[in-house]
């Protein structure tokens, strides 16, 4: 019989309390809040430090351990099909909502009065985003460079090739596979140690956000923010909820299952900060390692539902606020551009803004200087983006695993009904076994 851990030891409660304290500190002592930014940055950097090796271990172990290579291609194909369909729905929903609600109408902003210098860095980065450049960037110049830069897609590509090669070696490659499995357990132990700092990271990041931008500064653009948050909520409950119901599970129970990861993302505004834990959690939920290893990392570039909603809403909002004409032809062009450009966003803070800059440049008639309008609130909107992205990737993993019949449905039902035990165990490290890493 296991005893329930005290409430104060729950990561969920710790992060929630830390976020609350961070908001209060940032509001009443803004200068102190701004000075705490390194706490949030440091936590995210610690997470990023182990993402590449964890993806490598998970993908290689999953692919090398499969019976047939055909199933890898099948999983990847189904995943990309799902990503394209759902992200397109997200783009269309964002476009419909912003046209119906018209949050930017009546602002009559003169583009010449905007401070374009504040968005110059984003516009420059966005100008470099091309389809060919994105595809070529998936191929790393060197293996070491891919791991050093922490580029998820580059690491994923090398990991898939490594897994295929190891699979072809058969029993000869077994010692290497065993070593990678052991290395994975070490990496997940490191993640467990880092996660003990999650409340500190969330506290620092939230204190900085409120201290830097202030709650009062949100009033003018609060309408757009409210529309965006409500749209994301409806997307999760209606669209993703409908997908979940069609596949025999509840999105509400899934959200409860990943509640700790959602709070970490809420504090850091980066869905990437929860990636290592998501790999372990989705495998423990019943999805095979090979599916989790392909769907989750790939989804961080190809299945960003929250970012897709944000991109269409923000682009049309800028057009409305600056009285720029957006007829049906312009909006279809915008949608087509975003179908490609949105795949270049990563699950890190600020990437959505860079893709938005690229989109405004590509569409042509939309003023890039209009980005200055939403620069101040982008940081606040990033929370909803990141949370929606995380839930979207969790749903995608379960759905794709069910499609390729690599999901333990009994385990899925059991874990969701129980709400999922905390991933971080409070027992001494010596007593922890395989449970700390991905489920075997």
Swiss-Prot record:
Residues 419-440 are annotated as: Disordered. The gene is dctA. This is C4-dicarboxylate transport protein. It comes from Pseudomonas putida (strain ATCC 47054 / DSM 6125 / CFBP 8728 / NCIMB 11950 / KT2440). Disulfide bonds: none annotated. NCBIfam families: PRK01663.1, PRK13027.1. Responsible for the transport of dicarboxylates such as succinate, fumarate, and malate from the periplasm across the membrane. SUPFAM superfamilies: Proton glutamate symport protein (SSF118215). It is found in: Cell inner membrane. One of its GO terms (biological process) is L-aspartate transmembrane transport. HAMAP family: C4_dicarb_transport.
